[in-house]
Protein backbone atom coordinates (compact mmCIF):
# COMPACT_ATOMS: atom_id res chain seq x y z
CA UNK A 1 0.00 0.00 0.00
CA UNK A 2 2.85 2.38 0.87
CA UNK A 3 4.51 1.70 -2.48
CA UNK A 4 1.25 2.31 -4.33
CA UNK A 5 0.82 5.77 -2.84
CA UNK A 6 4.48 6.78 -3.23
CA UNK A 7 6.50 5.26 -6.07
CA UNK A 8 3.44 3.93 -7.90
CA UNK A 9 1.63 7.25 -7.67
CA UNK A 10 4.69 9.15 -8.89
CA UNK A 11 5.01 6.83 -11.90
CA UNK A 12 1.32 7.24 -12.74
CA UNK A 13 1.60 11.02 -12.46
CA UNK A 14 4.59 11.02 -14.83
CA UNK A 15 2.62 8.83 -17.24
CA UNK A 16 -0.30 11.27 -17.18
CA UNK A 17 2.04 14.24 -17.69
CA UNK A 18 3.44 12.58 -20.78
CA UNK A 19 -0.05 11.79 -22.12
CA UNK A 20 -1.12 15.41 -21.62
CA UNK A 21 1.56 16.59 -24.03
CA UNK A 22 -0.91 16.45 -26.92
CA UNK A 23 -2.98 19.11 -25.13
CA UNK A 24 -0.28 21.32 -23.61
CA UNK A 25 1.65 21.47 -26.90
CA UNK A 26 -1.43 23.01 -28.52
CA UNK A 27 -1.19 25.94 -26.10
CA UNK A 28 1.50 27.45 -28.33
CA UNK A 29 -1.14 27.91 -31.03
CA UNK A 30 -4.28 28.55 -28.99
CA UNK A 31 -2.85 30.17 -25.88
CA UNK A 32 -4.05 29.23 -22.41
CA UNK A 33 -6.03 30.77 -19.56
CA UNK A 34 -4.72 30.11 -16.07
CA UNK A 35 -7.74 29.55 -13.84
CA UNK A 36 -7.47 29.51 -10.07
CA UNK A 37 -9.79 29.35 -7.09
CA UNK A 38 -9.45 28.72 -3.38
CA UNK A 39 -11.30 26.57 -0.87
CA UNK A 40 -10.84 24.85 2.49
CA UNK A 41 -10.39 21.08 2.77
CA UNK A 42 -11.77 18.69 5.41
CA UNK A 43 -8.85 19.50 7.71
CA UNK A 44 -9.68 23.19 7.57
CA UNK A 45 -6.60 24.00 5.51
CA UNK A 46 -6.87 26.62 2.76
CA UNK A 47 -6.00 25.28 -0.69
CA UNK A 48 -5.64 26.98 -4.05
CA UNK A 49 -6.20 25.06 -7.29
CA UNK A 50 -4.49 26.09 -10.53
CA UNK A 51 -5.61 24.82 -13.94
CA UNK A 52 -4.78 25.53 -17.56
CA UNK A 53 -7.84 25.96 -19.80
CA UNK A 54 -7.94 26.38 -23.57
CA UNK A 55 -9.94 25.20 -26.56
CA UNK A 56 -8.28 21.78 -26.25
CA UNK A 57 -9.58 21.13 -22.72
CA UNK A 58 -8.92 21.63 -19.02
CA UNK A 59 -5.62 20.49 -17.50
CA UNK A 60 -5.12 20.36 -13.74
CA UNK A 61 -1.72 21.91 -12.98
CA UNK A 62 -1.33 22.06 -9.20
CA UNK A 63 -2.92 22.60 -5.80
CA UNK A 64 -1.18 24.50 -3.02
CA UNK A 65 -1.63 24.43 0.75
CA UNK A 66 -1.80 27.95 2.14
CA UNK A 67 -2.32 27.05 5.80
CA UNK A 68 0.96 28.73 6.77
CA UNK A 69 0.21 31.89 4.83
CA UNK A 70 -2.53 34.43 4.69
CA UNK A 71 -4.36 34.75 1.39
CA UNK A 72 -2.75 38.07 0.66
CA UNK A 73 -2.16 39.48 -2.77
CA UNK A 74 1.63 38.92 -2.83
CA UNK A 75 1.34 35.22 -1.96
CA UNK A 76 -1.37 34.54 -4.54
CA UNK A 77 0.51 36.53 -7.15
CA UNK A 78 3.76 34.65 -6.48
CA UNK A 79 1.96 31.30 -6.70
CA UNK A 80 0.46 32.12 -10.08
CA UNK A 81 3.73 33.54 -11.37
CA UNK A 82 5.45 30.22 -10.61
CA UNK A 83 2.85 28.40 -12.71
CA UNK A 84 3.24 30.91 -15.55
CA UNK A 85 6.99 30.46 -15.58
CA UNK A 86 6.66 26.67 -15.52
CA UNK A 87 4.55 26.57 -18.69
CA UNK A 88 5.86 29.73 -20.39
CA UNK A 89 4.42 33.17 -19.61
CA UNK A 90 4.12 34.22 -23.26
CA UNK A 91 1.58 31.54 -24.09
CA UNK A 92 -0.66 32.69 -21.21
CA UNK A 93 -3.40 35.03 -22.43
CA UNK A 94 -5.26 35.69 -19.19
CA UNK A 95 -5.60 34.66 -15.57
CA UNK A 96 -9.09 34.14 -14.16
CA UNK A 97 -9.36 34.24 -10.39
CA UNK A 98 -11.87 35.31 -7.78
CA UNK A 99 -13.34 38.82 -7.82
CA UNK A 100 -12.17 39.53 -4.26
CA UNK A 101 -9.95 42.56 -3.62
CA UNK A 102 -6.84 40.52 -2.77
CA UNK A 103 -7.22 38.55 -6.01
CA UNK A 104 -7.51 41.77 -8.00
CA UNK A 105 -4.34 42.98 -6.32
CA UNK A 106 -2.65 39.69 -7.26
CA UNK A 107 -3.80 40.27 -10.83
CA UNK A 108 -2.18 43.70 -10.78
CA UNK A 109 1.12 42.13 -9.65
CA UNK A 110 0.95 39.68 -12.56
CA UNK A 111 0.12 42.37 -15.11
CA UNK A 112 2.98 44.49 -13.80
CA UNK A 113 5.54 41.73 -14.41
CA UNK A 114 3.96 40.38 -17.61
CA UNK A 115 2.13 43.25 -19.34
CA UNK A 116 0.87 40.90 -22.06
CA UNK A 117 -1.31 38.94 -19.58
CA UNK A 118 -4.85 40.07 -18.73
CA UNK A 119 -6.50 39.69 -15.35
CA UNK A 120 -10.17 38.71 -15.62
CA UNK A 121 -12.74 38.12 -12.93
CA UNK A 122 -14.97 35.06 -13.09
CA UNK A 123 -18.05 35.94 -15.16
CA UNK A 124 -20.26 33.36 -13.45
CA UNK A 125 -19.32 34.67 -10.00
CA UNK A 126 -19.98 38.23 -11.19
CA UNK A 127 -23.43 37.28 -12.49
CA UNK A 128 -24.24 35.48 -9.27
CA UNK A 129 -23.36 38.63 -7.33
CA UNK A 130 -25.53 40.60 -9.76
CA UNK A 131 -28.51 38.37 -9.00
CA UNK A 132 -27.84 38.91 -5.30
CA UNK A 133 -27.74 42.68 -5.86
CA UNK A 134 -31.09 42.61 -7.67
CA UNK A 135 -32.80 40.55 -4.97
CA UNK A 136 -31.34 42.72 -2.21
CA UNK A 137 -32.08 46.16 -3.71
CA UNK A 138 -32.03 48.54 -0.75
CA UNK A 139 -34.36 51.25 -2.01
CA UNK A 140 -37.45 51.30 0.19
CA UNK A 141 -39.96 50.75 -2.60
CA UNK A 142 -38.20 47.53 -3.64
CA UNK A 143 -37.22 45.94 -0.36
CA UNK A 144 -40.24 43.70 -0.87
CA UNK A 145 -38.10 41.63 -3.28
CA UNK A 146 -35.66 40.61 -0.54
CA UNK A 147 -38.53 40.13 1.90
CA UNK A 148 -40.29 37.88 -0.62
CA UNK A 149 -37.21 35.66 -0.88
CA UNK A 150 -36.83 35.54 2.89
CA UNK A 151 -40.48 34.56 3.22
CA UNK A 152 -40.04 31.69 0.77
CA UNK A 153 -36.85 30.51 2.47
CA UNK A 154 -38.58 30.57 5.84
CA UNK A 155 -41.35 28.34 4.48
CA UNK A 156 -38.84 25.89 2.98
CA UNK A 157 -36.76 25.79 6.14
CA UNK A 158 -39.76 25.15 8.37
CA UNK A 159 -41.15 22.31 6.25
CA UNK A 160 -37.82 20.56 5.65
CA UNK A 161 -36.70 20.87 9.28
CA UNK A 162 -40.04 19.62 10.64
CA UNK A 163 -40.06 15.88 9.95
CA UNK A 164 -43.84 15.44 10.23
CA UNK A 165 -44.60 18.46 8.04
CA UNK A 166 -42.01 17.25 5.54
CA UNK A 167 -43.64 13.84 5.51
CA UNK A 168 -47.05 15.35 4.73
CA UNK A 169 -45.52 17.42 1.93
CA UNK A 170 -43.94 14.34 0.38
CA UNK A 171 -47.32 12.63 0.16
CA UNK A 172 -48.49 15.46 -2.10
CA UNK A 173 -45.39 16.10 -4.22
CA UNK A 174 -42.94 14.07 -6.29
CA UNK A 175 -40.50 16.97 -6.14
CA UNK A 176 -38.52 17.95 -3.08
CA UNK A 177 -38.27 21.44 -1.68
CA UNK A 178 -34.77 22.70 -2.42
CA UNK A 179 -32.57 24.00 0.37
CA UNK A 180 -30.18 25.83 -1.93
CA UNK A 181 -27.02 27.08 -0.27
CA UNK A 182 -25.87 30.67 -0.71
CA UNK A 183 -22.67 29.49 -2.36
CA UNK A 184 -24.53 27.75 -5.19
CA UNK A 185 -24.80 29.78 -8.35
CA UNK A 186 -28.28 31.14 -9.15
CA UNK A 187 -29.59 30.10 -5.73
CA UNK A 188 -32.32 32.78 -5.76
CA UNK A 189 -33.69 31.70 -9.11
CA UNK A 190 -33.57 27.99 -8.26
CA UNK A 191 -35.36 28.57 -4.95
CA UNK A 192 -38.18 30.62 -6.47
CA UNK A 193 -38.57 28.28 -9.43
CA UNK A 194 -38.90 25.16 -7.30
CA UNK A 195 -41.41 26.90 -5.03
CA UNK A 196 -43.52 27.71 -8.07
CA UNK A 197 -43.30 24.11 -9.27
CA UNK A 198 -44.59 22.72 -5.96
CA UNK A 199 -47.21 25.41 -5.36
CA UNK A 200 -50.11 23.05 -5.95
CA UNK A 201 -48.58 20.41 -3.67
CA UNK A 202 -48.08 23.00 -0.92
CA UNK A 203 -51.72 24.09 -1.23
CA UNK A 204 -52.85 20.47 -0.99
CA UNK A 205 -50.61 19.98 2.04
CA UNK A 206 -52.01 22.89 4.08
CA UNK A 207 -55.57 21.92 3.04
CA UNK A 208 -55.15 18.36 4.24
CA UNK A 209 -56.55 16.96 7.46
CA UNK A 210 -53.09 15.73 8.46
CA UNK A 211 -51.73 19.28 8.39
CA UNK A 212 -54.60 20.60 10.50
CA UNK A 213 -54.10 17.81 13.05
CA UNK A 214 -50.37 18.53 13.16
CA UNK A 215 -50.99 22.25 13.59
CA UNK A 216 -53.52 21.66 16.39
CA UNK A 217 -50.99 19.47 18.22
CA UNK A 218 -48.43 22.28 18.36
CA UNK A 219 -47.75 22.91 22.04
CA UNK A 220 -45.99 26.27 22.02
CA UNK A 221 -47.23 29.63 20.80
CA UNK A 222 -44.11 29.93 18.64
CA UNK A 223 -44.80 26.62 16.84
CA UNK A 224 -48.44 27.51 16.25
CA UNK A 225 -47.37 30.85 14.80
CA UNK A 226 -44.86 29.09 12.52
CA UNK A 227 -47.53 26.74 11.19
CA UNK A 228 -49.88 29.66 10.61
CA UNK A 229 -47.24 31.74 8.81
CA UNK A 230 -46.46 28.87 6.43
CA UNK A 231 -50.16 28.34 5.77
CA UNK A 232 -50.68 32.07 5.18
CA UNK A 233 -47.82 32.18 2.70
CA UNK A 234 -49.02 29.15 0.75
CA UNK A 235 -52.54 30.55 0.42
CA UNK A 236 -51.46 34.12 -0.29
CA UNK A 237 -52.24 34.72 -3.97
CA UNK A 238 -50.20 37.93 -3.96
CA UNK A 239 -47.11 36.03 -2.79
CA UNK A 240 -47.25 33.70 -5.78
CA UNK A 241 -47.88 36.52 -8.25
CA UNK A 242 -44.83 38.34 -6.94
CA UNK A 243 -42.74 35.16 -7.15
CA UNK A 244 -43.70 34.83 -10.83
CA UNK A 245 -42.86 38.46 -11.46
CA UNK A 246 -39.42 38.25 -9.82
CA UNK A 247 -38.67 35.03 -11.69
CA UNK A 248 -39.46 36.77 -14.95
CA UNK A 249 -36.87 39.50 -14.52
CA UNK A 250 -34.09 37.40 -12.97
CA UNK A 251 -34.48 34.62 -15.54
CA UNK A 252 -32.25 36.41 -18.11
CA UNK A 253 -29.48 36.54 -15.48
CA UNK A 254 -29.96 32.82 -14.80
CA UNK A 255 -29.67 31.99 -18.49
CA UNK A 256 -26.57 34.14 -18.73
CA UNK A 257 -25.07 32.14 -15.84
CA UNK A 258 -25.84 28.91 -17.67
CA UNK A 259 -24.29 30.31 -20.84
CA UNK A 260 -21.09 31.34 -19.05
CA UNK A 261 -20.74 28.27 -16.82
CA UNK A 262 -18.83 26.20 -19.35
CA UNK A 263 -15.28 25.22 -20.19
CA UNK A 264 -15.94 26.06 -23.84
CA UNK A 265 -14.33 29.18 -25.34
CA UNK A 266 -17.26 31.62 -25.40
CA UNK A 267 -15.36 34.85 -24.77
CA UNK A 268 -16.33 36.26 -28.18
CA UNK A 269 -20.02 36.19 -27.28
CA UNK A 270 -19.87 37.74 -23.81
CA UNK A 271 -20.34 41.36 -24.89
CA UNK A 272 -23.40 40.64 -27.00
CA UNK A 273 -24.91 38.23 -24.47
CA UNK A 274 -24.61 40.82 -21.69
CA UNK A 275 -26.32 43.44 -23.88
CA UNK A 276 -29.07 40.94 -24.72
CA UNK A 277 -29.54 40.05 -21.06
CA UNK A 278 -30.02 43.70 -20.12
CA UNK A 279 -32.36 44.21 -23.06
CA UNK A 280 -34.51 41.24 -22.02
CA UNK A 281 -34.77 42.61 -18.48
CA UNK A 282 -35.78 45.98 -19.94
CA UNK A 283 -38.52 44.39 -22.04
CA UNK A 284 -39.94 42.70 -18.93
CA UNK A 285 -39.59 45.45 -16.32
CA UNK A 286 -39.43 48.85 -18.01
CA UNK A 287 -43.04 48.96 -19.34
CA UNK A 288 -44.39 48.10 -15.87
CA UNK A 289 -41.96 49.83 -13.53
CA UNK A 290 -39.32 52.12 -15.10
CA UNK A 291 -37.89 53.01 -11.70
CA UNK A 292 -37.20 49.35 -10.87
CA UNK A 293 -35.55 48.90 -14.26
CA UNK A 294 -33.37 51.95 -13.55
CA UNK A 295 -32.14 50.31 -10.32
CA UNK A 296 -31.50 46.96 -12.03
CA UNK A 297 -29.69 48.70 -14.90
CA UNK A 298 -27.41 50.46 -12.40
CA UNK A 299 -26.55 47.13 -10.74
CA UNK A 300 -25.77 45.50 -14.10
CA UNK A 301 -23.52 48.37 -15.18
CA UNK A 302 -21.71 48.36 -11.83
CA UNK A 303 -20.91 44.65 -12.04
CA UNK A 304 -19.97 44.82 -15.72
CA UNK A 305 -17.58 47.72 -15.07
CA UNK A 306 -15.84 45.64 -12.39
CA UNK A 307 -15.50 42.68 -14.77
CA UNK A 308 -15.04 44.22 -18.21
CA UNK A 309 -11.53 43.96 -19.63
CA UNK A 310 -10.24 44.96 -23.07
CA UNK A 311 -9.84 41.27 -23.98
CA UNK A 312 -13.64 40.88 -24.07
CA UNK A 313 -13.92 43.80 -26.49
CA UNK A 314 -11.25 42.37 -28.79
CA UNK A 315 -12.91 38.95 -28.79
CA UNK A 316 -16.24 40.60 -29.63
CA UNK A 317 -14.72 42.39 -32.63
CA UNK A 318 -13.03 39.18 -33.83
CA UNK A 319 -16.30 37.20 -33.84
CA UNK A 320 -17.41 37.16 -37.52
CA UNK A 321 -21.12 36.47 -36.99
CA UNK A 322 -21.64 39.93 -35.50
CA UNK A 323 -20.86 41.39 -38.94
CA UNK A 324 -23.36 39.27 -40.86
CA UNK A 325 -26.37 41.10 -42.39
CA UNK A 326 -28.78 38.53 -40.92
CA UNK A 327 -27.62 39.29 -37.37
CA UNK A 328 -27.47 43.06 -37.88
CA UNK A 329 -31.01 43.07 -39.30
CA UNK A 330 -32.55 41.45 -36.21
CA UNK A 331 -33.89 43.85 -33.57
CA UNK A 332 -31.97 43.53 -30.32
CA UNK A 333 -33.77 42.89 -27.01
CA UNK A 334 -34.73 46.15 -25.38
CA UNK A 335 -35.50 47.82 -28.70
CA UNK A 336 -31.89 48.76 -29.48
CA UNK A 337 -30.61 48.79 -33.05
CA UNK A 338 -27.73 46.41 -33.67
CA UNK A 339 -24.48 47.68 -35.15
CA UNK A 340 -21.08 46.32 -36.04
CA UNK A 341 -18.98 45.81 -32.89
CA UNK A 342 -16.07 48.08 -33.87
CA UNK A 343 -18.40 51.05 -34.42
CA UNK A 344 -19.21 51.19 -30.70
CA UNK A 345 -16.90 53.73 -29.03
CA UNK A 346 -16.52 51.70 -25.83
CA UNK A 347 -15.70 48.53 -27.77
CA UNK A 348 -13.28 50.41 -30.00
CA UNK A 349 -11.34 51.78 -27.03
CA UNK A 350 -11.26 48.30 -25.51
CA UNK A 351 -9.97 46.37 -28.51
CA UNK A 352 -7.31 49.00 -29.27
CA UNK A 353 -6.06 48.73 -25.70
CA UNK A 354 -6.03 44.94 -25.94
CA UNK A 355 -3.96 44.97 -29.13
CA UNK A 356 -1.38 47.31 -27.58
CA UNK A 357 -1.18 44.99 -24.57
CA UNK A 358 -0.78 41.78 -26.57
CA UNK A 359 1.71 43.18 -29.10
CA UNK A 360 4.48 45.30 -27.61
CA UNK A 361 6.61 45.68 -30.76
CA UNK A 362 5.50 48.86 -32.63
CA UNK A 363 6.30 47.48 -36.09
CA UNK A 364 4.38 44.25 -35.43
CA UNK A 365 1.51 46.31 -34.10
CA UNK A 366 1.44 48.35 -37.32
CA UNK A 367 1.25 45.19 -39.44
CA UNK A 368 -1.49 43.83 -37.20
CA UNK A 369 -3.57 47.00 -37.45
CA UNK A 370 -3.26 46.90 -41.23
CA UNK A 371 -4.59 43.33 -41.29
CA UNK A 372 -7.34 44.25 -38.85
CA UNK A 373 -8.40 47.08 -41.16
CA UNK A 374 -8.85 44.57 -44.01
CA UNK A 375 -11.01 42.39 -41.76
CA UNK A 376 -13.21 45.28 -40.61
CA UNK A 377 -13.51 46.66 -44.14
CA UNK A 378 -14.22 43.21 -45.65
CA UNK A 379 -11.27 43.44 -48.03
CA UNK A 380 -9.04 40.73 -49.46
CA UNK A 381 -9.84 37.21 -48.19
CA UNK A 382 -12.48 38.62 -45.85
CA UNK A 383 -14.51 40.10 -48.71
CA UNK A 384 -15.05 36.90 -50.69
CA UNK A 385 -18.56 35.53 -51.14
CA UNK A 386 -17.86 32.40 -49.10
CA UNK A 387 -16.22 34.33 -46.26
CA UNK A 388 -19.30 36.54 -45.97
CA UNK A 389 -21.75 33.65 -46.21
CA UNK A 390 -19.96 31.61 -43.55
CA UNK A 391 -19.80 34.34 -40.91
CA UNK A 392 -22.93 33.07 -39.17
CA UNK A 393 -22.84 29.49 -40.49
CA UNK A 394 -19.67 28.16 -38.82
CA UNK A 395 -17.99 28.78 -35.49
CA UNK A 396 -15.63 31.72 -35.12
CA UNK A 397 -12.53 29.53 -34.91
CA UNK A 398 -13.58 27.51 -37.96
CA UNK A 399 -14.12 30.72 -39.88
CA UNK A 400 -10.67 32.03 -39.01
CA UNK A 401 -9.12 28.67 -39.90
CA UNK A 402 -10.71 28.81 -43.36
CA UNK A 403 -10.21 32.47 -44.20
CA UNK A 404 -7.64 34.01 -41.85
CA UNK A 405 -4.31 32.58 -43.04
CA UNK A 406 -3.58 35.36 -45.65
CA UNK A 407 -3.32 37.71 -42.64
CA UNK A 408 -1.03 35.62 -40.40
CA UNK A 409 -0.62 38.07 -37.52
CA UNK A 410 -4.34 38.71 -37.16
CA UNK A 411 -5.08 35.01 -37.64
CA UNK A 412 -2.73 34.05 -34.82
CA UNK A 413 -4.23 36.66 -32.50
CA UNK A 414 -7.80 35.65 -33.35
CA UNK A 415 -7.14 31.97 -32.65
CA UNK A 416 -5.47 32.74 -29.32
CA UNK A 417 -8.06 35.25 -28.12
CA UNK A 418 -11.17 33.31 -29.20
CA UNK A 419 -9.88 30.12 -27.52
CA UNK A 420 -10.25 31.55 -24.00
CA UNK A 421 -12.87 30.87 -21.33
CA UNK A 422 -14.66 33.35 -19.07
CA UNK A 423 -15.09 31.62 -15.71
CA UNK A 424 -13.29 29.73 -12.96
CA UNK A 425 -15.81 26.88 -12.71
CA UNK A 426 -13.13 24.41 -13.78
CA UNK A 427 -11.15 25.16 -10.64
CA UNK A 428 -14.25 24.92 -8.46
CA UNK A 429 -15.07 21.46 -9.81
CA UNK A 430 -11.73 20.34 -8.40
CA UNK A 431 -13.28 20.80 -4.96
CA UNK A 432 -15.46 17.74 -5.50
CA UNK A 433 -12.57 15.70 -6.87
CA UNK A 434 -10.36 16.71 -3.97
CA UNK A 435 -13.05 15.99 -1.38
CA UNK A 436 -13.62 12.49 -2.79
CA UNK A 437 -9.91 11.74 -2.62
CA UNK A 438 -9.06 13.56 0.60
CA UNK A 439 -12.19 12.74 2.60
CA UNK A 440 -12.24 12.26 6.36
CA UNK A 441 -11.66 8.53 5.81
CA UNK A 442 -8.45 9.30 3.90
CA UNK A 443 -7.18 12.27 5.83
CA UNK A 444 -3.82 10.67 6.59
CA UNK A 445 -2.72 11.68 3.13
CA UNK A 446 -0.50 14.73 3.14
CA UNK A 447 -1.30 17.56 0.76
CA UNK A 448 1.42 16.59 -1.75
CA UNK A 449 0.06 13.05 -2.13
CA UNK A 450 -3.51 14.29 -2.27
CA UNK A 451 -2.51 16.80 -4.95
CA UNK A 452 -0.88 14.02 -6.99
CA UNK A 453 -4.03 11.92 -6.74
CA UNK A 454 -6.17 14.87 -7.83
CA UNK A 455 -3.76 15.52 -10.71
CA UNK A 456 -4.09 11.93 -11.93
CA UNK A 457 -7.83 11.71 -11.28
CA UNK A 458 -8.80 15.05 -12.82
CA UNK A 459 -6.58 14.81 -15.89
CA UNK A 460 -7.78 11.29 -16.64
CA UNK A 461 -11.13 12.95 -17.19
CA UNK A 462 -9.65 14.93 -20.07
CA UNK A 463 -7.84 11.91 -21.48
CA UNK A 464 -10.97 9.75 -21.25
CA UNK A 465 -12.81 12.17 -23.55
CA UNK A 466 -10.16 12.44 -26.25
CA UNK A 467 -7.84 9.43 -26.19
CA UNK A 468 -8.65 6.52 -28.51
CA UNK A 469 -7.48 4.08 -25.87
CA UNK A 470 -10.10 5.34 -23.45
CA UNK A 471 -12.89 4.22 -25.78
CA UNK A 472 -11.91 0.55 -25.42
CA UNK A 473 -9.88 0.32 -22.20
CA UNK A 474 -12.30 0.14 -19.26
CA UNK A 475 -9.59 1.18 -16.82
CA UNK A 476 -9.83 4.65 -18.37
CA UNK A 477 -13.62 4.74 -18.15
CA UNK A 478 -14.59 3.57 -14.66
CA UNK A 479 -12.07 5.71 -12.78
CA UNK A 480 -14.71 8.36 -12.05
CA UNK A 481 -16.83 6.27 -9.67
CA UNK A 482 -17.91 7.85 -6.43
CA UNK A 483 -15.67 6.06 -3.89
CA UNK A 484 -18.21 6.49 -1.09
CA UNK A 485 -21.01 4.78 -3.05
CA UNK A 486 -21.41 1.09 -2.14
CA UNK A 487 -23.58 0.42 -5.20
CA UNK A 488 -21.11 0.56 -8.09
CA UNK A 489 -23.85 1.16 -10.64
CA UNK A 490 -25.09 4.20 -8.74
CA UNK A 491 -21.54 5.26 -8.04
CA UNK A 492 -20.72 5.56 -11.72
CA UNK A 493 -22.35 8.98 -11.90
CA UNK A 494 -19.61 11.30 -13.01
CA UNK A 495 -18.61 14.17 -10.80
CA UNK A 496 -19.66 16.64 -13.49
CA UNK A 497 -23.19 15.22 -13.42
CA UNK A 498 -23.27 15.34 -9.63
CA UNK A 499 -22.19 18.99 -9.78
CA UNK A 500 -24.62 20.00 -12.53
CA UNK A 501 -27.71 17.99 -11.51
CA UNK A 502 -29.46 20.96 -9.96
CA UNK A 503 -28.43 23.72 -12.33
CA UNK A 504 -29.17 21.66 -15.43
CA UNK A 505 -32.84 21.05 -14.67
CA UNK A 506 -35.29 21.50 -17.51
CA UNK A 507 -36.74 24.97 -17.30
CA UNK A 508 -40.49 24.71 -17.25
CA UNK A 509 -41.23 28.10 -15.77
CA UNK A 510 -43.80 28.81 -18.45
CA UNK A 511 -45.80 25.76 -17.45
CA UNK A 512 -45.49 26.65 -13.78
CA UNK A 513 -46.60 30.22 -14.40
CA UNK A 514 -49.72 28.93 -16.13
CA UNK A 515 -50.63 26.79 -13.12
CA UNK A 516 -53.99 27.85 -11.66
CA UNK A 517 -54.06 29.05 -8.05
CA UNK A 518 -54.96 26.41 -5.47
CA UNK A 519 -58.69 25.90 -5.04
CA UNK A 520 -59.29 25.48 -1.33
CA UNK A 521 -61.58 26.96 1.27
CA UNK A 522 -58.85 27.84 3.76
CA UNK A 523 -58.19 31.57 3.72
CA UNK A 524 -56.26 32.63 6.81
CA UNK A 525 -57.34 35.66 8.74
CA UNK A 526 -53.85 37.08 9.11
CA UNK A 527 -50.55 37.07 7.26
CA UNK A 528 -47.06 38.51 7.75
CA UNK A 529 -46.68 41.94 6.24
CA UNK A 530 -43.82 43.34 4.22
CA UNK A 531 -41.56 46.00 5.72
CA UNK A 532 -42.84 49.53 5.89
CA UNK A 533 -42.24 51.36 2.63
CA UNK A 534 -42.11 48.23 0.50
CA UNK A 535 -44.66 48.13 -2.30
CA UNK A 536 -44.70 44.93 -4.32
CA UNK A 537 -46.79 44.90 -7.50
CA UNK A 538 -49.19 42.38 -5.94
CA UNK A 539 -49.88 42.90 -2.25
CA UNK A 540 -52.48 41.71 0.24
CA UNK A 541 -53.36 44.82 2.24
CA UNK A 542 -56.16 45.93 4.52
CA UNK A 543 -58.29 48.86 5.61
CA UNK A 544 -59.63 50.08 2.27
CA UNK A 545 -56.19 50.67 0.66
CA UNK A 546 -55.66 49.65 -2.93
CA UNK A 547 -55.26 45.93 -3.47
CA UNK A 548 -52.25 46.45 -5.75
CA UNK A 549 -49.17 48.15 -4.36
CA UNK A 550 -47.78 49.54 -7.64
CA UNK A 551 -49.75 49.91 -10.85
CA UNK A 552 -53.26 48.62 -11.49
CA UNK A 553 -55.24 45.51 -12.35
CA UNK A 554 -53.99 45.86 -15.93
CA UNK A 555 -50.42 45.82 -14.59
CA UNK A 556 -51.22 42.66 -12.68
CA UNK A 557 -52.60 41.10 -15.85
CA UNK A 558 -49.45 41.90 -17.85
CA UNK A 559 -47.15 40.61 -15.12
CA UNK A 560 -48.91 37.25 -14.85
CA UNK A 561 -49.50 36.76 -18.54
CA UNK A 562 -53.30 36.64 -18.34
CA UNK A 563 -56.41 38.36 -17.07
CA UNK A 564 -56.42 39.22 -13.39
CA UNK A 565 -59.47 37.24 -12.31
CA UNK A 566 -57.93 35.88 -9.11
CA UNK A 567 -59.19 37.84 -6.11
CA UNK A 568 -56.64 39.52 -3.86
CA UNK A 569 -57.19 38.44 -0.26
CA UNK A 570 -57.42 41.32 2.23
CA UNK A 571 -55.95 40.59 5.63
CA UNK A 572 -54.90 42.65 8.64
CA UNK A 573 -51.15 42.91 9.16
CA UNK A 574 -49.73 41.14 12.16
CA UNK A 575 -45.98 40.78 11.87
CA UNK A 576 -43.34 42.53 9.86
CA UNK A 577 -40.63 40.51 8.20
CA UNK A 578 -37.08 41.64 8.75
CA UNK A 579 -34.86 42.06 5.75
CA UNK A 580 -31.56 40.23 5.70
CA UNK A 581 -28.80 42.79 5.32
CA UNK A 582 -25.95 40.29 5.26
CA UNK A 583 -23.51 40.68 2.39
CA UNK A 584 -22.14 37.75 0.51
CA UNK A 585 -18.42 37.44 0.67
CA UNK A 586 -16.76 38.18 -2.60
PLM features: residue spans?
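Short coil/turn segments at secondary-structure boundaries
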Residues: 46-48, 63-66, 74-75, 107-110, ...
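Active-site beta-loop-alpha junctions of metal-dependent nucleic acid enzymes
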Residues: 11, 63-85, 262
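Structured nucleic-acid-interacting core domains from mobile-element enzymes and related host factors
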Residues: 1-59, 90, 291-301, 307, ...
Amino acid sequence: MTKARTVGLDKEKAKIQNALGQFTNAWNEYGVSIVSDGWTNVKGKPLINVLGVSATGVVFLSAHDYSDKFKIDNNIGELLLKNFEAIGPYIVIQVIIDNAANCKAAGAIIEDKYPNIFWSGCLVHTLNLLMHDIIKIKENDYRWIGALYKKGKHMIRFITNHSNAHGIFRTHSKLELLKVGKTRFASYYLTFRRLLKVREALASMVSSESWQVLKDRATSTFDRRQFQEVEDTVLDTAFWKNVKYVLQFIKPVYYMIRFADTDKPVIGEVYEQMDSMLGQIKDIVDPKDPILYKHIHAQVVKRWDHLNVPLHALAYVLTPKYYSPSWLAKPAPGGMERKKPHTDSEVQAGYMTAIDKLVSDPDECDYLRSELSKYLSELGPFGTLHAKRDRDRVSSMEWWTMYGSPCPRLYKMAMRVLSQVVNSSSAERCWSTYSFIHSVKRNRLNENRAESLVYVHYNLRLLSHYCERAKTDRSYVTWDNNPEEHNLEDGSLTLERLEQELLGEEDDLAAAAAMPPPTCSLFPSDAPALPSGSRPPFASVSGGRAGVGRGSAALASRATGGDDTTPIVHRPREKKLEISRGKRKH
